[in-house]
């Protein structure tokens, strides 16, 4: 039996609260069960030096966890004087995922930064960050259109992510912390709204997994992401 009696293919309740803060062009509080992440999208005119003069935009991301988002307090990385490898890996993943959602040529020479701050962690913080940041990004892009900075919205479609894994020999979708810490296999999957894969991060924590198990996990992820995209679109229609 999974926590909260979920079936193996069931994601936790997902909530997306838009316009959560007043200053950012896009802001969303995303909740996957007890995992809560604040995602903001900030627009700046201009692009990084390596893109200057190419007539295209850029999307980047930063990720961080509040000191008491976890069971015991973790010192802020700013206080340590450097970012950890996990943080850098996750923010690069978020940025790659969100760049797949946008026509960067149509964006023009704007940079959009997605800041994902974990308020409470109970597994799946990176997948929640991608899911919430995509909605914040959609709001920011719409503001560019409304303000006359862009003629058309460069958003190609929604992008969402979910974790899957093998726990006690069973393939499950959207792992909570207690499942994640006991998983034999742990995988994060990012997809477009039509089911095309952007990224798969998979690791055998204990027992190596088979090709058949990989296909099962990808199918589980696709089903979970389809339901998450429905929630994203409903939030944006509100």
From Swiss-Prot:
InterPro entries, sorted: ExoRNase_PH_dom1, ExoRNase_PH_dom2, ExoRNase_PH_dom2_sf, PNPase/RNase_PH_dom_sf, Ribosomal_Su5_D2-typ_SF, RNase_PH, RNase_PH_bac-type, RNase_PH_CS
Listed EC numbers: 2.7.7.56
Enzyme class: transferase
UniProt keyword annotations, A-Z: Nucleotidyltransferase, RNA-binding, rRNA processing, Transferase, tRNA processing, tRNA-binding
Cytoplasm recorded as keyword: no
GO molecular function annotations of the record: 3'-5'-RNA exonuclease activity; tRNA binding; tRNA nucleotidyltransferase activity
UniProt record, GO biological process: rRNA catabolic process; rRNA processing; tRNA processing
UniProt catalytic activity: tRNA(n+1) + phosphate = tRNA(n) + a ribonucleoside 5'-diphosphate
Binding residues for phosphate: 86, 124-126
Pfam families assigned to the protein according to its UniProt record, in alphabetical order: RNase_PH, RNase_PH_C
Family affiliation: Belongs to the RNase PH family.
Subunit and partners: Homohexameric ring arranged as a trimer of dimers.
Role, per record: Phosphorolytic 3'-5' exoribonuclease that plays an important role in tRNA 3'-end maturation. Removes nucleotide residues following the 3'-CCA terminus of tRNAs; can also add nucleotides to the ends of RNA molecules by using nucleoside diphosphates as substrates, but this may not be physiologically important. Probably plays a role in initiation of 16S rRNA degradation (leading to ribosome degradation) during starvation.
Designated name of the protein: Ribonuclease PH
Source species of the chain: Escherichia coli O6:K15:H31 (strain 536 / UPEC)
Upper taxonomic lineage: Bacteria, Pseudomonadati, Pseudomonadota, Gammaproteobacteria, Enterobacterales
């Amino acid at each position: 039996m999974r926590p909260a009696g979920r079936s193996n293919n069931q994601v936790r309740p997902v909530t997306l609260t838009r316009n959560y803060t007043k200053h950012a062009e896009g802001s969303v509080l995303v909740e996957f069960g007890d995992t809560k992440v604040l995602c903001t999208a900030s627009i700046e005119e201009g692009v990084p030096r390596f893109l200057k003069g190419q007539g295209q935009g850029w999307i980047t991301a930063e990720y961080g966890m509040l000191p008491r988002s976890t069971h015991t307090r973790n010192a802020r990385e700013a206080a340590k004087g450097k970012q950890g490898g996990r943080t850098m890996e996750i923010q690069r993943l978020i940025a790659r995922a969100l760049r797949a959602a946008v026509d960067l040529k149509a964006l023009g020479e704007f940079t959009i930064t997605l800041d994902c701050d974990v308020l409470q962690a109970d597994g799946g913080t990176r997948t929640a960050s991608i899911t919430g940041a995509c909605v914040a990004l959609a709001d920011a892009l719409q503001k560019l259109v409304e303000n006359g900075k862009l003629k058309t919205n460069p958003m190609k479609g929604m992008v969402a992510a979910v974790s899957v894994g093998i726990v006690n020999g069973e393939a499950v979708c959207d792992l909570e912390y207690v499942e994640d810490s006991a998983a034999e296999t742990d995988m994060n999957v990012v997809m477009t709204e039509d089911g095309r894969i952007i990224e798969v991060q998979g690791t055998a924590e204990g027992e190596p997994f088979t090709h058949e198990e990989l296909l099962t996990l990808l199918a589980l992820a696709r089903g979970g992401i389809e339901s998450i995209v429905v929630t994203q679109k409903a939030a944006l229609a509100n």
